[in-house]
Amino acid sequence: LPFAEGGQGAVFRGYLGGEIVCLKKISMVGVPALKRTKMLSSFKTELGIMIRLRHPRTVQVLGVVTTNPTFLGLVMEYLPGGSLRHALDRDDEVITPEYQRFWTADVALGMAHLYSCKIEHRDLKTHNVLLTHDGRCKVTDFGLSRCEELKTFTTTATMRDSVAGTPAFMAPELFEDNTFTEKSDVYSYAVVLWEIYDRGIPWAGLKPQQILYKLIKEQRLDVPKSMPRDLSSLMERAWAQDPDARPSFADICKELQATTPRRPSSISRPWSASSPTAGDAPPPASVASGQGSSRS
């Protein structure tokens, strides 16, 4: 059974070389053979880029499963801490200000590295930030947005199955002219900052059309009371209505460098969402590593 599911597919635990890995299955059921061939070609091209992308703040892509006609499989490193969203949702989780600053910097560093490699994310949120055993953040679910054939298919499926909530992370310009730039991901980063300090769901209870109306009218989420002034200033600049007024990820990293600890001074417990068990998922049958097989 999958231990996580999202708009792009279900995620299973598997084994590669004796190590636990994640296998994300992107369903190809119902996709015509010719279209599947085009999607596979696009997938392989981007896979090479993603495998070469190595950074402490991004999830490592290890390979791909291409032999099963019912799905495309993306093999990635397994992180035991689960998603940042999961940690924020836990009522028993005491999150210190030190960790909060640490996470804001980790996500910015991961995103800055993606853009240094000319890779857009397009779906940045705390669901797509994973935690290591010691509470470090790594950005995941990047890169596939560049696969045009695959993007068209998964976007259609996502809109059909789970459109609710998506606008909460989308920059206002995407509702107007649909022009995506780095600054669009920066807007999403601002919402991640809000999530880290509020621990709530952005625009909870509102329908997509209501969120859209607020964004176009330049309304934003209320600044969390616990948020330090320097970070609330950064957040408000990062979700500015005008994309040109938002900082780049490189600029954000420079700004955060002086106020972020190198690592948390103490770790009260291992960060673990759940304990993996043998049999959650079989080892991938064919893995090609490095090859293309509110404020009113």
List each model region and its residues.
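Conserved catalytic-loop aspartate of Hanks-type protein kinases
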Residues: D185
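Catalytic-loop of the protein kinase fold
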Residues: Y115-L131
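Glycine-rich ATP phosphate-binding loop
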Residues: A10-G30
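A short, aromatic-enriched beta-strand patch in the conserved N-lobe beta-sheet
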Residues: G63-V65
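Activation segment signature within eukaryotic-like protein kinase domains
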Residues: W103-T104
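Regulatory alphaC helix of protein kinase catalytic domains
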Residues: F43, L47-G48
